[in-house]
């Protein structure tokens, strides 16, 4: 969490999906009122079984992640990236890196990438279970219309 006098820090997991773009937009909407910075994290790694790429080079995987991050930021915010948004390319498994990134964050925001209306994706599920800060799971716009909000109270 934040030390006294520090600005809140929001970490957003970005994979280029509609849900991650919605997560970026949500972070942008929260950042202003909170005076927060937003770190847009695109995590990448060499897939298992691609040992040859370690010899030939892994730049293609990093480049693809960078392109996906740039496109997601453009989709979320338009041509001009807000000054409070800071893109980050992070090598490693997304769930592990985002959980580690949550150590010094005020909030971690991820998209829901599940199969079906009740199942979280593996990254969002791991983050909810193991993050070191509060986690907000954001649905893609087409999923949000099918979600029933609950307060957690017995009456509602």
Specify the residue positions occupied by each region the protein language model found.
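A short acidic, glycine-rich active-site loop
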Residues: 57-68
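Glycine-rich, Arg-bearing micro-motifs that act as flexible, cationic patches
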Residues: 107-130, 140, 144-147
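Active-site phosphate/pyrophosphate- and oxyanion-stabilizing loops and adjacent acidic/basic residues
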Residues: 74, 96, 125
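Structural beta-alpha unit
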Residues: 1-6, 19, 26, 77-108, ...
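Small/aliphatic-rich secondary-structure junction motif
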Residues: 2-56, 140-141, 155-156
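Short glycine-/small-residue-rich Rossmann-like dinucleotide-binding loops
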Residues: 15, 73, 113
